[in-house]
Amino acid sequence: MRLFLLVLWAALACGASPSWYFLQFSDPQFGMYEENRGFVQETANFEYAIATANRLHPAFVVVTGDLINQPGDAAEAAEYRRIAAKLDPGIPLYNVPGNHDVGNDPTPATLAAYRQRFGPDYYTFRAADLMGFVLNSSLIGHPAKAPEEAARQEAWLGAELEKARRPGIGRPVVFQHHPWFLKAPDEADEYSNIPKEIRARYLALLHQYGVRWVFAGHCHRNEQSSDGTLEIVATGPVGKPLGGARSGFRVVTVGPEGISHHYYDFGDIPNRLPPQ
């Protein structure tokens, strides 16, 4: 403990900010294992993830979508919220909507239901020298049934990114459910990405405002790609994995030199995670 305090004091004395970390969970998706007949395995996985977060005590936990499997399912939502409430009150929890939370084609009704159960579907938050932008990627990618809501979110994002340019606000980091793309920014449309025409518009906006990191989920496996200076990281699931992946979560370290990250399977989580 004494050594840690000396290192921290030295870093502050030299004008450097100490490193810190947060945890990214994704796709706990209560109901997926048993196709909405139950969620015993999801309960076990999420209980373990929350207990581990309490042990590691990160700056915050963000859950990048698909909290539940069936949009509007009261039992799945209640179980997610019951376990999430076990997180240490000193650790902020940020929910992000996924397509299984608001529907593949969100409507005003599904958006209202999500907001009632889980809170706002897009918003910003601050953590040390980071400015988090939570986006509703389902609404971005499929706006047809809620066009006014989609337009409102897009206008809001532009305004908030402009505010974030002010000195002292912190580096912008985006959290959403769908990755913008899997391999290349101009790839063809598919289930796992954002439609190309919409994607191009938003990528231009993120580049315009100097965003360097987007953390997503949706794929139930780990994927990483980039568009110039913009890194797109899709994180594997707390819930059911696909494609040979394993359940786990990502540790993201934020320091003076930038951002680094590592995905840990549940069986490989170290006893402690000092800032790197």
Regions found by a protein language model. Name each.
Residues 3-12:
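Sec-dependent N-terminal signal peptides
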Residues 30, 68-69, 101, 180, ...:
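Short active-site segment of divalent metal-dependent hydrolases/proteases
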Residues 173-180, 212-222:
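Histidine-centered catalytic micro-motifs
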Residues 36, 73-171, 189-192, 196-208, ...:
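Extended active-site neighborhood of metal-dependent phosphoesterases/phosphodiesterases
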Residues 164-184:
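Short acidic, glycine-rich surface-loop motifs adjacent to enzyme active sites
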Residues 14-77:
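N-terminal active-site segment of His-dependent metallophosphoesterases
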Residues 27, 65-66, 98-99, 177, ...:
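Active-site glycine-centered loops adjacent to acidic/histidine catalytic or metal-binding residues
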Residues 22-24, 62, 132-134, 173-175, ...:
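Structural motif
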